[in-house]
Every structure is written in C-alpha cells, then in structure tokens.
A protein has these predicted regions:
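Conserved alpha/beta enzyme-core scaffold
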Residues: 4-507
Length: 507
C-alpha cells in the first residue's frame, strides 16, 4: 500500500476499514502531507489535545522546513504534543484559529509571525457557514474506524470535525489504531443548516441526542487514509493545593446556601468547567460533598468527570472532547462499556451553543487571568498585550449561563502578582456577563449589585491581604475625587501593571 510505514495487515483492515473503495487509498503521512497545497485552509480535528492529527500535520511541518509552503489552520481547539510548535517553528502557518496552548506558537503569535484569530469556540463553524472566513479546502480527521458506507467514527473529540468534513473539498483520514475499535456509540454528530429559518437544537437535557454516531462524508472527497498508532497526549493533572482547595470550598459553600434558600437542589443544574487545574480541582471537590445525581454539559471532560462517575456523584456528562491523564485514559479504555452510556461527545458548536446553554440553565465555571473591582474579567492577555491561550468557550457559557462563575488565585508568583486589580488590562467578559467571582480568599456574589456595591464585595472577599489596603484606597479615592456610576482614576487604573513591568512586582 504505497510504502505505508505502518503495517496494515489484513486483520487490521477488516476491523478498521469496512468501505472497500478506501483500501486503494492507504498512504503514508509524508504522502498525505504532500497533498496539502500552499495557502490551503486546512480544517483539522483536535480539541484540547484529544483526537488530533498526530502524523499528517507533523509531516507537513517537516515538509515546510524544506519548502516554502504555509497554510491557514483551523482546529477545534489546542493540539497535542509539539504539533503547533513544529508548525510555527517551520513557518508553516499563515493564520491559526480558534484556540491554542503552545509556548512556541504563542511566541510566534505575539511576534505577529502567525496571525491568530481568538474566537468563541461556538462561532468558528457559524463563521464558516456564513462565509465570514474562507472555506475549508482540506480536512484532516482522526478516526478509530470507517464504516461500511465510508463514514468516519471519531475518536476522543469531535470539535469542528463534522463541519470540516462536510465543507472541505478534500479529506484525509487518520485511523488511529491505539483507539479500540469498540470506542464508538458515544458521538452525536450533526451539521447545522444554513440561514434563514434554521431549526432549533432540540436538546432539553444533557442526555438528549440529535445527530448520528458517525461523521457523514462524501467518499469521493477522500484523498487518502493514513494509519497511526499514537495515543492522545496525556493531560498533566496537578494535585489540588491550598489555593485550589480553598476556591473549591468557597464554591461548595455557596452552592449549599443556594440549596438552603431553595434556588437549587443537591443535583444542581448541568455543570460546565473550563480546562485546567483550577477548574478540575473545583469539580474534584464535589467528590466528598452532599451533591449527587449531578450532570455535566461542558466542552472538555477531564479526570474529574471520571472521578465523579466512580464516586457516584455524577450521572451523565456531555462534552466535545475527553482530555485526561494517562492513568484515567487507561481506566476509560479498560472500562469503556461501563462508561459508554454515561457519555456523549458533540460538535463544539453544539456543546457550546448559546441556545442550549440558556435552555439547560448551565452553571459555568471558568478560569480568569485577572478580574477588576467592578467584575470585568480578562481571560486571554498578560498585561493587556501578550496572548496567553485564548478565550476558548468561556464566553459561550458566561453570557448565557444560569450562573456565570469565574475563578482564579488572589495572587501568584510569591504574591508579586495580584489577580484582582483596579481595572483589567484586557476585557474578555464584561461586568454584565459575570455573576460570581471566587479566589482562595473568598467569594463575591455580584448578582443584583450596582458597580459600587460590586467593588465593595470584591475588595472585601476576593483580594489578597497584601493588596487589599492599596486597592481599597484606590477605590475610595476614585469615589471621592471622580465619582460617577463606575468610579475610576484613569491616571492610576493600571498602576499595578506598570509597576510590574518596571520592578517585576505589583507591590
């Protein structure tokens, strides 16, 4: 089969490729990479390191070291291993969207060597449908197998893959033999209709299905099938520390009070949590709590999801990807039949759909880089200038959730940086989208409060003790000397950031 480097024996082919017309299209990763044209818009599977292209994109990065070729790369979210780094370092990227989490690519973005479009994750497909961004030329989709009609059985994520395959002129499929052939039945793939008069998305509970368990494709589009045998890059799960434990305790106490006043029950409403150690730790806190029969309607299902399944606290989880540690991944694979009926993976325009988030009454828990005394949140930029990763799905949930919660440490880097400041250096989520703010110091419930009331609650409950006096003094001076609905002293609003730049500390 065209010098394919990975052995494709008869048994493997019978298991993985059930559509006979594809058998003549098995090629190597290098051959597939050679099919990518300069200036192509490539839509590749992958969402938070799960279900991504593990051989074709790395092979294209290698090719770009020797040839003057570059592409626009659109994925679901971040890619695993060093793929984004390899592409950036070989100058293989013209544009990148909608999310990334790689240090080398981040450097290229901040040097404007790669044009980065930081999008709400629910909007990428919408913009492709409407023609707001250039259409997909070539889709690269990871699969566990191909069914009798040539359709793709996805792996550990869906992301934007279903629409990429629908819109692309050409498709390359990576069949990953590390994923068991029985890893199917958990996917719910649907391609949205165009405007006008689009149908509603008929999801009323996290368990509802509206699509198919495979990605439907036109077999004539398929250029090649590449076999790989590489697992997803494992997530690094940090043990909860005193900061994340405190944040979790504050949130659990808040939920207890909401139950006591009759606003919620001990099953709460469907939970969403962003990626990362803080959100994962917060969810872990439910494990030893009174909260039972929980459900999730989220983007990324992390280790905490499976810990809560095993502890009996969580009944069902819907997401767009499964991004877990090596140990948790093996537990999932070994016990897949046990977990199968508790999981759904959806396209990210469905998992993050504002329509569904509002209908289900999601409790959204996302991580902030910093927030200010009036409740505005910065999720993306360091000191207002340098891109960190991207807004991801936090905005999809924040504006539409039943409860919009943002969490972060009160201070970091030996307390040289305060994460609560007079004015955020970059706005991702305005005060209008934020209900609850939580740090290790405490929780600020901002619902129904005017700006000055919010400032009092945030300063009292969320600011680190080493910064509280100065931030309170700033606020009181702003009230006295400037006044207004949202008092600010523009000459001093960013003094914490300028001090950090000049001295290496906000103190």
């Amino acid at each position: 089969f065209n010098n394919c480097k990975i052995m494709t024996n008869e048994t493997l082919l019978k298991e993985r490729v059930l559509f006979p017309d594809y058998l003549s299209k098995i090629i190597s990763a290098d051959q597939a990479a050679a099919m990518i044209q300069n200036n192509d818009v490539v839509g590749a599977s992958g969402f938070t390191k799960a279900g991504d292209s593990k051989s074709v994109l790395p092979a294209f990065a290698k090719r770009a070291k020797d040839e003057d070729v570059a592409i626009t790369l659109i994925t679901g979210a971040s890619l695993g291993y060093t793929t984004d780094a390899d592409l950036a370092e070989s100058k293989a990227l013209l544009r990148r969207m909608p999310f990334m989490a790689d240090a080398s690519l981040r450097k290229s973005i901040n040097n404007f060597e790669v044009k980065y479009i930081d999008q709400h994750l629910s909007e990428t497909v919408e913009q492709l449908i409407c023609g707001h961004i250039a259409p997909i030329d070539l889709a690269i989709i990871e699969a566990s197998s191909i069914d009798e009609k040539g359709n793709i059985i996805p792996t550990t994520s869906i992301g934007n893959s279903a629409f990429f395959a629908h819109q692309a002129k050409k498709i390359i499929i990576e069949i990953n033999t590390k994923i068991p052939v029985n890893f199917k039945g958990i996917h719910d793939c649907v391609v949205p209709k165009t405007y006008p008069n689009r149908d509603s998305l008929n999801i009323k509970t996290p368990t509802d299905r509206i699509g198919k368990s495979f990605i439907t494709i036109d077999p004539s589009k398929v250029l090649g099938i590449v076999f790989t045998d590489i697992t997803d890059q494992p997530a690094i799960i940090a043990e909860p520390d005193h900061v994340t434990k405190a944040i979790s305790e504050h949130l659990l106490n808040f939920f207890e009070k909401e139950v006591e006043r009759g606003a919620l029950t001990y099953s709460l409403l469907p939970l969403q949590a962003g990626i990362g150690k803080i959100a994962n730790s917060v969810l872990m806190g439910f494990k030893d709590s009174k909260f039972k029969n929980l459900t999730m309607y989220s983007e990324v299902l992390q280790d905490s999801t499976f810990e809560l399944f095993d502890s009996g606290n969580l009944d069902f989880a819907s997401g767009s990807s499964i991004t877990v540690s090596e140990e948790c991944y093996q537990r999932l694979i070994d016990n897949f039949e046990q977990y199968k009926d508790k999981l759904i993976l959806r396209p990210q325009n469905i998992s993050n759909s504002p329509e569904i988030v509002r209908r289900l009454g999601i409790i959204g828990i996302n991580t902030a880089i910093e927030f200010d005394i009036y409740g505005n949140v910065n999720s993306t930029h360091i000191s207002g200038t340098k891109m960190m990763n991207g807004i991801g799905g936090s905005g999809d949930f924040a504006r539409n959730a039943y409860l919009s919660i943002f969490v972060c440490p009160s201070a970091s880097k030996e307390n040289k940086i305060s994460h609560v400041i007079p004015m955020v250096s970059h706005h991702d989520h305005t005060e209008h989208d934020v209900d609850i703010l939580v740090t290790d110091q405490g929780l600020a419930d901002l619902r129904g409060l005017a700006p000055r009331e919010r400032a009092e609650v945030i300063i009292e409950n969320c600011v680190h003790p080493e910064y509280k006096e100065e931030i309170r003094a700033y606020y009181e001076k702003a009230v006295k000397e400037v006044g207004g609905h949202t008092p600010h002293i523009l000459e001093e609003a960013f003094k914490f950031h300028t001090r950090l730049k000049e001295t290496g500390s906000m103190k």
